[in-house]
Amino acid sequence: MLEGNLNYTGAVITWLKDDLKLISSAKETEGLAREANPADRTYLVPAFTGLGAPYWDEKATASISGITRTTGKAEVIKAALDCIAYQITDLVRAMEQDTGMRIEELRVDGGPTRNGYLMQFQSDITNKRVNIPDAEELSGIGAAYMAGISAGVYDLEKLAGNMKRSVYEPKMDDEIREKKYAGWKKAVDGVLSK
């Protein structure tokens, strides 16, 4: 199991709601992202508190770039959702490079997993299957299962087989994926302090 630290992922949705007042609830983001112009190239780099892995730049600052005359609320919301997936993609690629191993699947939990647009984009931009268990927050469940397995109360194979899941498969063309990711990397380069 590998883990990486990101400073600002799901909290970007809170920023849209509480600070910018663009939405009244996180649920609105999926519909707005789907309404956005698919050709829009707006990127949000949420370096409000610097950037964590793999950049480790505490002096990086947030930015919204690529705005055009046709960029509106829906496009900014989409850029906010996309930045979550881009940051995770940065981590996945860094982990693959550091370990020399290919990650086949992402297993994710938490509130943002309820957003179908975000989960499909995550699958598309990482080019990985995204597996989401029906249980929203797995940390507590996982700790209980680990204790139960250690005590001989639970069987790992049986538990794994009983979990219901939603699965997203990548659908994005490789050329489009790399073009979008290159745009993200350019946006990130623009905020780095080094």
Locations of the language-model features?
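Glycine/Thr-rich phosphate-binding loops that ligate phosphate moieties of nucleotide
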Residues: 1-194
